[in-house]
């Protein structure tokens, strides 16, 4: 789901390899979820073209559950989701009153747009845009109140790109929520223990032992990059 991946159609030798056989058969599944009193109808378009971006991952559900249990206030907030995949986290934020930009690589946007149209009523504040970490984050404003990401920390070569993107997007008084499956083999713990704390005040907001998912909350530690 991480939207730092260069478009695999144009960069076959990128650090974001596709597992062609991961979802070899192309098909769609529709799932229903309920958070904060909203019923979310989410379509997952499985196929080798989308790869890991096709599905709703456990970390996304954990983050939505956290927003519900903690009554996180999105009303009137400027929100951006990174590596959205299906868009479920950003869609919930929009339904909760946020002014939301949902982002991923260009090839994922059609799936996200379909889910936005299926769940966010006309007039709802949810837009879908392409964003590749470390490449075009500067075309986005740097004053978001909330920056969201679910299971986007799993490829070590992308960590510096993600860190730079977070530093740019998060406003001076903004908050970052990152939910992540803690995969030791992917260096996930190292990102949260060593990289992110260099620039952000970081705290573990919630730990889901059953799913091995951590939810972190971060705020700027010092002056933001120019």
Curated annotation (Swiss-Prot):
Instruction: Write the gene name.
Output: EEF1AKMT3
State one molecular function term (GO).
methyltransferase activity
Its annotated compartments are: Cytoplasm; Cytoplasm, Cytoskeleton, Microtubule organizing center, Centrosome
Spell out the disulfide connections: none
Where is this protein chiefly located? cytoplasm
Q: Name the EC number(s).
A: 2.1.1.-
**Name used for this protein in its record:** EEF1A lysine methyltransferase 3
- Family to which the UniProt record says this protein belongs: Belongs to the methyltransferase superfamily. METTL21 family.
The function of this protein is: Protein-lysine methyltransferase that selectively mono-, di- and trimethylates 'Lys-165' of the translation elongation factors EEF1A1 and EEF1A2 in an aminoacyl-tRNA and GTP-dependent manner. EEF1A1 methylation by EEF1AKMT3 is dynamic as well as inducible by stress conditions, such as ER-stress, and plays a regulatory role on mRNA translation.
The reply to whether Iron-sulfur figures as a keyword in the UniProt entry is: no
Reactions catalysed: L-lysyl-[protein] + 3 S-adenosyl-L-methionine = N(6),N(6),N(6)-trimethyl-L-lysyl-[protein] + 3 S-adenosyl-L-homocysteine + 3 H(+); L-lysyl-[protein] + S-adenosyl-L-methionine = N(6)-methyl-L-lysyl-[protein] + S-adenosyl-L-homocysteine + H(+); N(6)-methyl-L-lysyl-[protein] + S-adenosyl-L-methionine = N(6),N(6)-dimethyl-L-lysyl-[protein] + S-adenosyl-L-homocysteine + H(+); N(6),N(6)-dimethyl-L-lysyl-[protein] + S-adenosyl-L-methionine = N(6),N(6),N(6)-trimethyl-L-lysyl-[protein] + S-adenosyl-L-homocysteine + H(+)
What cellular component GO annotations does this protein have? centrosome; chromosome; cytoplasm; cytosol; nucleoplasm; protein-containing complex
Where does the chain bind S-adenosyl-L-methionine? 57, 83-85, 104, 133, 150
Question: What is the species listed in this Swiss-Prot or TrEMBL entry?
Answer: Bos taurus
Q: Which SUPFAM superfamilies match?
A: S-adenosyl-L-methionine-dependent methyltransferases
Assembly and binders: Interacts with members of the heat shock protein 70 and 90 families and of the TCP-1 chaperonin family, as well as with HSPD1, STIP1 and tubulin; at least some of these proteins may be methylation substrates.
